[in-house]
Amino acid sequence: MVMEDEPREATIKPSYWLDACEDISCDLIDDLVSEFDPSSVAVNESTDENGVINDFFGGIDHILDSIKNGGGLPNNGVSDTNSQINEVTVTPQVIAKETVKENGLQKNGGKRDEFSKEEGDKDRKRARVCSYQSERSNLSGRGHVNNSREGDRFMNRKRTRNWDEAGNNKKKRECNNYRRDGRDREVRGYWERDKVGSNELVYRSGTWEADHERDVKKVSGGNRECDVKAEENKSKPEERKEKVVEEQARRYQLDVLEQAKAKNTIAFLETGAGKTLIAILLIKSVHKDLMSQNRKMLSVFLVPKVPLVYQQAEVIRNQTCFQVGHYCGEMGQDFWDSRRWQREFESKQVLVMTAQILLNILRHSIIRMETIDLLILDECHHAVKKHPYSLVMSEFYHTTPKDKRPAIFGMTASPVNLKGVSSQVDCAIKIRNLETKLDSTVCTIKDRKELEKHVPMPSEIVVEYDKAATMWSLHETIKQMIAAVEEAAQASSRKSKWQFMGARDAGAKDELRQVYGVSERTESDGAANLIHKLRAINYTLAELGQWCAYKVGQSFLSALQSDERVNFQVDVKFQESYLSEVVSLLQCELLEGAAAEKVAAEVGKPENGNAHDEMEEGELPDDPVVSGGEHVDEVIGAAVADGKVTPKVQSLIKLLLKYQHTADFRAIVFVERVVAALVLPKVFAELPSLSFIRCASMIGHNNSQEMKSSQMQDTISKFRDGHVTLLVATSVAEEGLDIRQCNVVMRFDLAKTVLAYIQSRGRARKPGSDYILMVERGNVSHAAFLRNARNSEETLRKEAIERTDLSHLKDTSRLISIDAVPGTVYKVEATGAMVSLNSAVGLVHFYCSQLPGDRYAILRPEFSMEKHEKPGGHTEYSCRLQLPCNAPFEILEGPVCSSMRLAQQAVCLAACKKLHEMGAFTDMLLPDKGSGQDAEKADQDDEGEPVPGTARHREFYPEGVADVLKGEWVSSGKEVCESSKLFHLYMYNVRCVDFGSSKDPFLSEVSEFAILFGNELDAEVLSMSMDLYVARAMITKASLAFKGSLDITENQLSSLKKFHVRLMSIVLDVDVEPSTTPWDPAKAYLFVPVTDNTSMEPIKGINWELVEKITKTTAWDNPLQRARPDVYLGTNERTLGGDRREYGFGKLRHNIVFGQKSHPTYGIRGAVASFDVVRASGLLPVRDAFEKEVEEDLSKGKLMMADGCMVAEDLIGKIVTAAHSGKRFYVDSICYDMSAETSFPRKEGYLGPLEYNTYADYYKQKYGVDLNCKQQPLIKGRGVSYCKNLLSPRFEQSGESETVLDKTYYVFLPPELCVVHPLSGSLIRGAQRLPSIMRRVESMLLAVQLKNLISYPIPTSKILEALTAASCQETFCYERAELLGDAYLKWVVSRFLFLKYPQKHEGQLTRMRQQMVSNMVLYQFALVKGLQSYIQADRFAPSRWSAPGVPPVFDEDTKDGGSSFFDEEQKPVSEENSDVFEDGEMEDGELEGDLSSYRVLSSKTLADVVEALIGVYYVEGGKIAANHLMKWIGIHVEDDPDEVDGTLKNVNVPESVLKSIDFVGLERALKYEFKEKGLLVEAITHASRPSSGVSCYQRLEFVGDAVLDHLITRHLFFTYTSLPPGRLTDLRAAAVNNENFARVAVKHKLHLYLRHGSSALEKQIREFVKEVQTESSKPGFNSFGLGDCKAPKVLGDIVESIAGAIFLDSGKDTTAAWKVFQPLLQPMVTPETLPMHPVRELQERCQQQAEGLEYKASRSGNTATVEVFIDGVQVGVAQNPQKKMAQKLAARNALAALKEKEIAESKEKHINNGNAGEDQGENENGNKKNGHQPFTRQTLNDICLRKNWPMPSYRCVKEGGPAHAKRFTFGVRVNTSDRGWTDECIGEPMPSVKKAKDSAAVLLLELLNKTFS
């Protein structure tokens, strides 16, 4: 307890946190914190009421202190001794409490297995503690000093290749450092801005994260219980699941199971009898048998309908431990390839799917029947006729050898799926047929007592209703409309009725939808859709009444008017006119009846109201609710009397009213038609008496108003949970739907089959349920059906038990027989894939749907029948198939067959065979998308890792070194001998072309060097001239010159190597001794000094005198000359959590550094090391000895330095090291007019009191140094900068004035604090240029080496340009060449594919091109050729440059040969890191050893380099050179000249078509005359044009697109040679885009010659032409594709197709094509006329100003609305039918609004400044308008520097939001010297990290102002 009269600081022990943290791993510290049990600490004076030490970090200090001293864990928290650590136990109650606290579970929710896991974690932590203590005891036993720190062991850990992971680890370490920083004070609260009240700074207890999480939980608290339950379910043991399932089985279920184990079985049991449980038990039995054979099980569970997929899969998952996969059509399995399916088969044990999916993958040989172990068929009675169940069995099961067939288990509530059975024999025949089909035996229950006990049957109630009065006039009117539509459709198509409805009558459309999920929504369906809608209205009129029919018609009309797609259908007006007429007719009739007032009120709504809100597909519009005063019976009664609602509907409503007070009411109403299911809930919603009902519809997939699976699942879930109490459903809900809460089932429409009767009854699962059958009074057929259904059910049950003997049956034709030989099929022997007559029609439709097309084209097969009359009146048929014009063939005649259906199947089967033979089908009999065998390369990463070829995919690659630099001679020289070797001396010449405005003499006082190589360099390297950016406005050129060859002895070589190491260790700030330097033979060259006389012979040109002087001097014995500046200066706040003074002392003493370290900078003002520490280290002479010589030496003109006396004038030009700060300075002059007693200068702009009186006072107060020689003149010096990258322009982006830029900053130093450096200033300045020069030389040598590999002569400098990325920030990069290479590669590959594959359509060609030119493929090519070793991708950093004999700074602390005293006890890496990598093996992506020779490259960079190489070779050597390079890379695109002739020969156009085209006008517009007219015809023919033997333009568009792209890119590249790559890319994008080409087509009237057959396209073209004409009327306006009207893509396509046609017609002459198109494309975009897309302009503006940009889009009917928000404030909005156009307009409006706002603010600021007078004069310095200083992080940093505090500590407390509108929230605190750590201040969420830190800094400044004021 802290005494009141004693300061708090006095009660806290000195913390050992720093010492412990620096030689104890972060993992161990975390373990100790977690092991520290507060409950075990006795409550005493030093603890609070909870038993926790008041100063938490003091308690941790106690633990760490004990560990460091070898005493183990202290006895007051964890344990007494080492041996007791493993005996520490924690009670389960405590663990359970902690688990509840962390996971949010219930208090009793902990499980025993969780205890063991947590105890295991604690054991591992204790093991690490023991290991650490053992290590410490070993070290201390050897006599090492206790307070010495161990080197950072974790620098040796293996590095992963995943760059993102490295970043994450860095963040974790920073987080750990942040936690350490809080050692002095426990965090008890935080400060933030009051968001509700006065916006003042408010204090809150706790942590920001906890408060924020609590707020979030308040919002989502309702879901907590569900989460807990889900967690509990996950924690259930697997054995428990198995046992529960076994215990649930009833005796009759086990009986059926035993039979199913013995043989194939069909379980014939009532709904709710538990058939699924039997299937689950059977799956487990099969799995157990296979496990005994070490085989994996694959069971397939088939269901007939989509809802059952989800239901059954969930049941199996809950009841078993198997991996279960579920599959239905909406999941897109039709487009899965075999590899995706194989992954599913390997990872799953049970597959639940619809039968059609299994049939598909069997037919395409993705799976084989013999690989399935168990096949379960739910509702197996469907296995009749052509149902997928039946086809699976007949086509695949029965054709598989018996010993390889899977076991079969069928489940059904009725084995007969017909209207009923006429007799016992009839029933027996139907059951036998099902058994034969499924190769199984029906099994049912003989004793039904147990079944009746567990499966209660609902009460069956029959309700009669009166027959509805027929509305003859309305019915006849609608029928006449239907007939008129059919007649109009027949007339327009000029086809027979079969042809118009042929696909539908032949069943192709239904099969197509079921088999491949293709939904035919095209223009020609308009008439059929209208007929369907009129028939639905007519049905509703008859069955539900006029009121409902009006609602249906109104909904159809509303949906048609608001559907965006109708704009592109040819007969929109046609449909709208008919529907409007019907709605008007029904409306008039309603106005005359009892509901006239209601309808009139409804009709009288304003047109701009919400009567026609946007609806989901398949929904009806909501209508207003009837006023509460009306009684339902009065409304319905009046409606029935007037014929507006049928008695059937009235009876249904009365039935529902009877259940008004029924508890937990849940009902299903079954209807026959979808339209009834949709309209009845709307009727119920309008009746107030049915307000107790919450109603929803449930419809299936096979209709025009289909319901998505997700919607269906949502509806079922709501019904199960009670959010929906009434389902109006079609037959989709009859089978298998398991809703145990359902207590009422109503058959609004009587079932059509016995099965439907039984199945729908089974939906009433709750005991005491009602099954209500509504029958028409007096309807004989209804009564007969009910009798037949009841009798048939009993007959079926009896037959299943008694088994009638059919051996004496005379008519055996009714019994089916299964033929093991498949019927007429086409089978691919290579894969086993097959197509039969049953699947051929659907496959042809699927193929057509995959052909490339647009919304205007109708891509589906057309069939025409021909009758063949045979003698005897028999008629046969043959079918003619016509495929779309972009298929490999168009017409195919089929064989003569007995029926139209069979004829259609036969011709489709023949078409499938032919398509496969022509390559349109793969060997899996799926449409070939152009993938081929290369598809394997394009596989996606299933684990979510970045895909190769993208910028996010990064890898480590070894840095390349040219072979010419390699030499073993650098490793010699250890033994002194006189033998000599031949070397080559190269002098580097640096000449200043122009000094500019610089007058600095230092820039010209530079020593020269030469470079010694073991091999001769290439001549191109010597001819290279490089720019060095030494100073602003100074132009410096550097080059190499060969000076000759010379022999050097081993002794001389040894001296040169020592000189080289001494020189580079200073230049690169690396402390290294020449004797311990490792020399890499990969870099064999040396830097040597040269004499002024360059005309001497090479051996005499070396300055041997300087070499001897530098290598023999004793000055190097002083560590101050070797130590890097960071010894004293330290680094940023993330370097260490401790005292930087101790850091500096440790660096001096032991040459080791603890903790994380980053490269130091001079950006931190002021020194941080105490001079006393330096003096105490013994590294400086005793300064007392100086006093005796001071007077004598000063009189001789000498200066007393820290290391002796020196003549003052000799110091000029030297380098001195400041002992008090460790910094180095060039000596500019000696200031004889200044001394230590000179007044210390006042800071510029500072008006306060002087901080220091004299220089002596400054050094005394700042560094604690008493100067002895205060009368000595001061040394004027300038800082020695770090070695910089001189290859990058560093002075262009500064916005400061020239005066500021040219200003040199000097310091004035007392000589007695300076040590003279052995190396002169001119020598260092010259040497600092060497790294940059060698970087360029090394890069150039690599380029020469690559050039030799490619073996084609082009300038090496161009190859270097292609290898240099923009990230290098040099004066050249590959981006311009990459742009040209990309276009050239695309053109060459497109030409090659077009000519080589004349049968491939445009979609296939596009995919094949993508596989040849994609970044992933180019990346793989680059790896094969080793380009990763030649690429320059990083900005050159000398500190990371690996000079010969000098390791880089980056790996300073992990290098060999260091002087650490821990080196005696080195452990293997695998042993040290055993806590991280338990197996001791390197993980994928990790690298061992030194990482300095590795660099990170993205795979996109490698791909870009390939394109850049193609570009430079094309520029320098034309097509021949580019093609040579592509061939070397691996891209083979050589084409045969004869292929062009073959292509032209394939263009055969009928004479009638040629005569219909105005070639003269079109060729006049193009100014080109075609030799082959057929190419021009094809180029202007759209796919919507009815086929006339002419292909569409798609293939020509494919090649023309590449031709124009290449030609325009080439034109821009060579026209604007100095344009930056980014601007060149923008120019290309503006010139090469479909919108621009479309305007070219309109400008030259090419659209007038377009051959198409779409009225919607014609309409859109007219609108676009009008818009372009309006644009053209504006003087000087050219949108270059950025106009306000989006062009039809077809117009741009024909420009590209015509370009392709000209290219082919001219014999592949691109010059001819450019000659035609250059004038057509005028005016061409230029840098001056280049428009910027508003979206991009706004994005860039927001990025520059760090503002959050967000777009919000919504759609209402046919209009899209896009809103623009900046920092949450709306700044723009626009509406357009097209979303992208609306976004562009909204961005444009936002930009205009922002500009207006800026102008207004500028004016207001001008007015305010004018009125403010002189008081506001300070604003010119950047202050805010109110005169207050704008606080930022820099303000806080300045305060910390003045107060001598550590830098503030920031942390990100939250990062969230979408990618385009991220928000960052930061916290900050600072460690004050006298009061410890401040509370954390949390800033506001900001769109950038900088602004977020600024926001937090402002709060902390306010807090500091309050605290210290």
Swiss-Prot record:
SUPFAM superfamilies per record: dsRNA-binding domain-like, P-loop containing nucleoside triphosphate hydrolases, PAZ domain, RNase III domain-like
CDD domains, alphabetized: DEXHc_dicer, DSRM_DCL_plant, PAZ_CAF_like, RIBOc, SF2_C_dicer
Gene3D superfamilies reported in the protein's UniProt record: 3.30.160.20, Dicer dimerisation domain (3.30.160.380), P-loop containing nucleotide triphosphate hydrolases (3.40.50.300), paz domain (2.170.260.10), Ribonuclease III domain (1.10.1520.10)
Motif interval(s): DECH box: 378-381
Description of the deletion phenotype: Embryonic lethality in sus-1 mutant. Weaker mutant (caf-1) also exists. Mutant caf-1 produces extra whorls of stamens, indefinite number of carpels and show an absence of axillary inflorescence meristems and abnormally shaped leaves and floral organs.
Site, Important for activity: residue positions: 1689
The Helicase C-terminal domain, residue ranges: 651-812
Cofactor: Mg(2+); Mn(2+)
Domain of life: Eukaryota
Coiled-coil ranges from the UniProt annotation: none
UniProt cross-references to InterPro entries, sorted A to Z: Dicer_dimer_sf, Dicer_dimerisation_dom, dsRBD_dom, Helicase/UvrB_N, Helicase_ATP-bd, Helicase_C-like, P-loop_NTPase, PAZ_dom
Compositionally biased residues, Polar residues: 131-146
PAZ domain ranges (all copies): 1189-1318
Localisation: Nucleus
Keyword field: ATP-binding, Endonuclease, Helicase, Hydrolase, Magnesium, Manganese, Metal-binding, Nuclease, Nucleotide-binding, Nucleus, Repeat, RNA-binding, RNA-mediated gene silencing
Residues in Helicase ATP-binding domain copies: 256-433
EC number, as in UniProt: 3.1.26.-
Membership in a protein family: Belongs to the helicase family. Dicer subfamily.
Function: Ribonuclease (RNase) III involved in RNA-mediated post-transcriptional gene silencing (PTGS). Functions in the microRNAs (miRNAs) biogenesis pathway by cleaving primary miRNAs (pri-miRNAs) and precursor miRNAs (pre-miRNAs). Functions with DRB1/HYL1 and SERRATE proteins for accurate pri-miRNAs to miRNAs processing. Indirectly involved in the production of trans-acting small interfering RNAs (ta-siRNAs) derived from the TAS1, TAS2 or TAS3 endogenous transcripts by participating in the production of their initiating miRNAs.
Assembly with partners or alone: Interacts (via N-terminus) with DDL. Interacts (via DRBM domains) with DRB1, DRB2 and DRB5. May interact with AGO1 or AGO10 through their common PAZ domains.
Leftover remarks: Expression in the early embryo is from the maternally contributed genome.
Official protein name in the record: Endoribonuclease Dicer homolog 1
Organism: Arabidopsis thaliana
Gene: DCL1
